[in-house]
UniProtKB/Swiss-Prot annotation:
The keyword Transcription regulation does not apply. It comes from the Bacteria. Belongs to the MinC family. Interacts with MinD and FtsZ. It holds the Pfam family MinC_N_1. Disulfide bonds: none annotated. Cell division inhibitor that blocks the formation of polar Z ring septums. Rapidly oscillates between the poles of the cell to destabilize FtsZ filaments that have formed before they mature into polar Z rings. Prevents FtsZ polymerization. GO terms for biological process: cell morphogenesis; division septum assembly; regulation of cell septum assembly. It comes from Symbiobacterium thermophilum (strain DSM 24528 / JCM 14929 / IAM 14863 / T). This is Probable septum site-determining protein MinC.
Length: 228
């Protein structure tokens, strides 16, 4: 029996929403609406599979659930009742990045390369033990650390955390965002033999070399403010 609302990111389906299977369902939906509202626009556009545990939903319950998600800009893919939600929804897919449940500290660790067309969204920090290919997207409310090449889109501190960072062994994103500030990597593919860290300074995103390399290079940051 579950008593808490749990939202987990996956690379296979987008989001997995686990709902409590005790208490009035209307009360659960009220708690869900409050949780989503407190996350701002983080989950907007998210595709969701919902697991309701041992609860059996009526057609009216399903409609109310879908409306609650739609009000937060989310898309309901399916509703599952009974069984193991992690086994059914997060079963490994050949060649797909692994996205295990977040360990202590609300950090999501992905142990494979994130491919083009795949998207990771997580409420917390994200660590990727692999590359982020062009066409892949990583969004986090906290830091993003890539132990490989970052060539896709990365958005750290997406709910407004300007102290968030994006770090990578090779930092060449097609687009880089921290909070509301948007930048991109310089044109070309200059050699890089050390990790780099991107952070906000003033209203620009700058890239700092690793501790032993005290060089600082500015991104071609437009300092654009994301439309809200």
């Amino acid at each position: 029996m579950r008593q808490d609302i749990v939202i987990r990111g996956t690379t296979r389906t987008g989001l997995l929403l686990l709902l409590p299977d005790e208490g009035e369902f209307s009360a659960v939906l009220e708690r869900l609406a409050e949780r989503l509202a407190s996350s701002g626009r983080f989950f907007v556009g998210g595709r969701v599979q919902v697991h309701v545990g041992n609860r059996r939903l009526s057609p009216e319950d399903r409609e109310a659930l879908e409306q609650t998600l739609q009000r937060s800009g989310m898309v309901l893919l399916s509703v599952k009742e009974g069984g193991d939600p992690l086994a059914e929804v997060q079963a490994p897919e050949a060649g797909a990045p692994s996205a295990p449940p977040p360990p202590a500290g609300n950090t999501l660790v992905v142990t494979k390369t994130v491919r083009s067309g795949q998207e990771i969204r997580h409420d917390g920090d994200v660590i990727i033990l692999g590359d982020v290919n062009p066409g892949a997207v990583v969004v986090a409310t906290g830091h993003i650390v890539v132990m490989g090449a970052l060539r896709g889109v990365a958005h750290a501190g997406c709910t407004g955390n300007r102290t968030a960072i994006v770090a990578a062994t090779k930092l060449r994103p097609t687009q880089l965002r921290i909070a509301e500030v948007i930048g991109r990597a310089p044109d070309g593919d200059a050699p890089q033999s050390y990790p780099e860290v991107a952070r906000i300074r003033g209203d620009l995103i700058v890239v700092e070399a690793s501790a032993e390399k005290r060089q600082v290079s500015a991104l071609e940051a437009v300092g654009a403010k994301e439309d809200r």
